[in-house]
Amino acid sequence: MASLRDIQTRITSTKKTSQITKAMEMVSAAKLNRAEQNAKSFVPYMEKIQEVVSSVALGSRGASHPMLTARSVKKTGYIVITSDRGLAGAYNSNILRKVSQAIEERHQSPDEYGVIAIGRVGRDFFVKRGIPVLLEITGLADQPAFADIQGIASQTVQMFADGTFDELYLYYNHFINTISQEVTEKKLLPLTDLQPSGKLVGYEFEPSQEEILEVLLPQYAESLIYGGLLDGKASEHAARMTAMKSATDNAKDLINNLTLSYNRARQAAITQEITEIVGGAAALE
């Protein structure tokens, strides 16, 4: 049985840990509020650019662009958005499990795929397992701007355009609410499943439809990556807040149990001392 001093030491240590997890919970809650606003405010832009792209690509006959055309798949690219830090529950493990399953099911050789890792946890996971990481970025801000991700997003889209990849998939955690995030797989390129959000709008093209698509389609694909990042950041903060709340609650339960054990041990020690005193007094009579 643990001594009173050991139990008291554990109580003190657990209280300090609970203070840390509570502080992390509050910080994550504040970050979540802003990240959720960022993700939601980006939705109208994405809806509008999708409407324009759909109208330009589908509204006129003869639209042609490599990003709109499926081709024989020799190599697949996986854009995987994870966090730079842990302590976020199953946020990272769920998405990495999903990507690993997809790679295992679709490919026989590492030559058939490559990973673009956004986030340190994902990067380290793939490198450790010998999975080829062709591009990576870590250390992104908790509230990233488009400029932070534009470089790697542009490089990734260019890798499809120049034939390095024949298709691109985007993996991220979609934010539903504070306690629910969903691992999402989205086929980024080619854009073969464009659907008009409403009635197609007619446009007059100057200089030409193809030249407009040449500029617009890469921007649209890059925006999809940025939208996934914003969604992922909101999910990360929500997952970390939930994990830290659970840790704080567990610490409180542990403190209560340890306090009960301490009181019982102290009571037993006092009872033992009284028994010894009474026994000693009886022996002197």
From Swiss-Prot:
Subcellular location: Cell membrane
Role summary: Produces ATP from ADP in the presence of a proton gradient across the membrane. The gamma chain is believed to be important in regulating ATPase activity and the flow of protons through the CF(0) complex.
InterPro entries listed in its UniProt record: ATP_synth_F1_ATPase_gsu (IPR035968), ATP_synth_F1_gsu (IPR000131), ATP_synth_F1_gsu_CS (IPR023632)
Molecular function per GO: ATP binding; proton-transporting ATP synthase activity, rotational mechanism
Keyword Nucleotide-binding: no
Membrane topology reported for the UniProt record: Peripheral membrane protein
Organism listed in the record: Priestia megaterium (strain ATCC 12872 / QMB1551) (Bacillus megaterium)
GO BP annotations listed: proton motive force-driven plasma membrane ATP synthesis
Keyword annotations of the record: ATP synthesis, Cell membrane, CF(1), Hydrogen ion transport, Ion transport, Membrane, Transport
Protein family according to the UniProt entry: Belongs to the ATPase gamma chain family.
Pfam short name (any one): ATP-synt
GO terms for cellular component: plasma membrane; proton-transporting ATP synthase complex
Gene designation per UniProt: atpG
CDD domains: F1-ATPase_gamma
Domain of life per record: Bacteria
Protein name in UniProt: ATP synthase gamma chain
The protein's assembly and partners: F-type ATPases have 2 components, CF(1) - the catalytic core - and CF(0) - the membrane proton channel. CF(1) has five subunits: alpha(3), beta(3), gamma(1), delta(1), epsilon(1). CF(0) has three main subunits: a, b and c.
